[in-house]
Curated annotation (Swiss-Prot):
The keyword Transmembrane does not apply. Its cofactor is heme. This is Cytochrome P450 2F1. It is a peripheral membrane protein. The lineage of its organism: Eukaryota, Metazoa, Chordata, Craniata, Vertebrata. It comes from Homo sapiens (Human).
Length: 491
């Protein structure tokens, strides 16, 4: 690009930023925050290598509620359990909008369930929850699917024969098959090219969006669209995933029986047919493709990433692993796989899983929210349409809620009698109106997968347990666990 073109591009960017800044000066009394620079906002204060740490550091200076400018975009940041709970739970309706997330929104155009707002979001969410329940989410039928898939996973793990291996791909394939069976009506063989493509695309995008490139794109999307870098693969990957889903939808249309839909896609197609004469219907091809995309992405990555963190923690703390295995042997034995009915009798295992989720904190900054109306909150007035970042990391590491927040400690979820205890500050699935609709499915998968694996194997690191690093490789959209290999020793 020559110097004249560069100058024109920078001038246009400056004009856009100026217009955005002027348009944001509407009514309202926002909390204080660092003074922004023109165009850059507070970018110089925010270390692009670690946005989370930078925002958390600002909360120590400005308190649990402050205003920050991500480039030209003005955002309110909430930190700590009390502030986040008051927003997402106590005033859930006002904070139920979806904030701007260019890496997702520029692709979904607000058509998917995760990145829509208003009536569209409410209609799609209600419909999706009902269909997922109909197909067994939280019930015995989905438990049977998980147990079946768990058996396939155990067979794959046995093939390692005690040799070192990276569990990333085998875990992702198995976990993804659960949501695939709900969305598409059947599971894939582990060597099926469609499943391998799904895993590759989702893993690549999650990694990019959890990197400095992903964070920078979400601050300056218009500029970064013209800059080469790994962020350019985000939309290429999303398009490939969309095309794969569209091909499956085409096959589903050919075999659709409206009287007996066999999976989520066919239920959605049936609803589309019922409302085809309604010009205001939210059920059309774009919302089907994007909702399926959102469910596939979330249903694949959150559980598999949590299992990766769990493996690392259990290898670093072998006494914790041994105690979980002792509880499995006592309650379940070896003659059958663990079942959900066992969870109530396994408080320590339940506490360990919750502590993994708290400590791993895989979506540390949550997805952005947006206030749906002018909102009075904590003595301030947040104008309608203002984006809000709720730092879930500061909830999960809040010293007022957890005795030793910086340590991996299952006792955080056990009472004096060693019975399981809930914590209101446990928010790995967010909270309030935007609570992840796959929460119950994810909790089932985590319990059934982890107990089945530890019933059959012991996890052994290649080096000393104390050398295992539990800090994330990078933080952005998610906290990425560090790559590792391990050996599985049959029990």
């Amino acid at each position: 690009m020559d110097s004249i073109s560069t100058a024109i591009l920078l001038l246009l960017l400056a004009l856009v930023c100026l217009l955005l800044t002027l348009s944001s000066r509407d009514k309202g009394k926002l909390p204080p925050g660092p003074r922004p620079l023109s165009i850059l906002g507070n970018l110089l204060l925010l270390c692009s290598q670690d946005m989370l740490t930078s925002l958390t550091k600002l909360s120590k200076e400005y308190g649990s509620m402050y205003t920050v400018h991500l480039g030209p975009r003005r955002v309110v940041v909430l930190s700590g359990y009390q502030a986040v709970k008051e927003a997402l739970v106590d005033q859930g309706e006002e904070f139920s909008g979806r904030g701007d997330y260019p890496a997702f929104f520029n692709f979904t155009k607000g058509n998917g369930i995760a990145f829509s707002s208003g009536d569209r979001w409410k209609v799609l969410r209600q419909f999706s929850i009902q269909i997922l329940r109909n197909f067994g989410m939280g019930k015995r039928s989905i438990e049977e699917r998980i147990l079946e898939e768990g058996s396939f996973l155990l067979a794959e793990l046995r093939k390692t024969e005690g040799e070192p291996f990276d569990p990333t791909f085998v875990l992702s394939r198995s976990v993804s098959n659960i949501i695939c069976s709900v969305l598409f009506g059947s599971r894939f063989d582990y060597d099926d090219e469609r499943l391998l493509t799904i895993i590759r695309l989702i893993n690549d995008n999650f990694q990019i969006m959890s990197s400095p490139w992903g964070e920078l794109y979400d601050i300056f999307p218009s500029l970064l669209d013209w800059v080469p870098g790994p962020h350019q693969r985000i939309f290429q990957n999303f398009k490939c995933l969309r095309d794969l889903i569209a091909h499956s939808v085409h096959d589903h249309q050919a075999s659709l029986d409206p009287r007996s839909p066999r999976d989520f896609i066919q239920c959605f197609l049936t609803k589309m047919a019922e409302e085809k004469e309604d010009p205001l219907s939210h059920f059309h091809m774009d919302t089907l493709l994007m909702t399926t995309h959102n469910l596939l992405f979330g249903g694949t990555k959150t559980v598999s990433t949590t299992l990766h963190h769990a493996f690392l923690a259990l290898m670093k703390y072998p006494k914790v692993q041994a105690r979980v295995q002792e509880e499995i042997d006592l309650v379940v034995g070896r003659a059958r796989l663990p079942a959900l009915k066992d969870r109530a009798a396994m408080p320590y295992t339940d506490a360990v899983i919750h502590e993994v989720q708290r400590f791993a904190d895989i979506i540390p900054m949550n997805l952005p929210h947006r206030v749906t109306r002018d909102t009075a909150f904590r003595g301030f007035l947040i104008p309608k349409g203002t984006d809000v970042i709720t730092l879930l990391n500061t909830v999960h590491y809040d010293p007022s809620q957890f005795l030793t927040p910086q340590e991996f400690n299952p006792e955080h979820f056990l009472d004096a009698n060693q019975s399981f205890k809930k914590s209101p500050a446990f928010m790995p699935f967010s909270a309030g109106r935007r609570l992840c609709l796959g929460e119950s499915l994810a909790r089932m998968e985590l319990f059934l997968y982890l107990t089945a694996i530890l019933q059959s194997f012991s996890l052994q690191p290649l080096g000393a347990p104390e050398d295992i690093d539990l800090t994330p490789l990078s933080s952005g959209l998610g906290n990425l666990p560090r790559p590792f290999q391990l050996c599985l020793r049959p029990r």
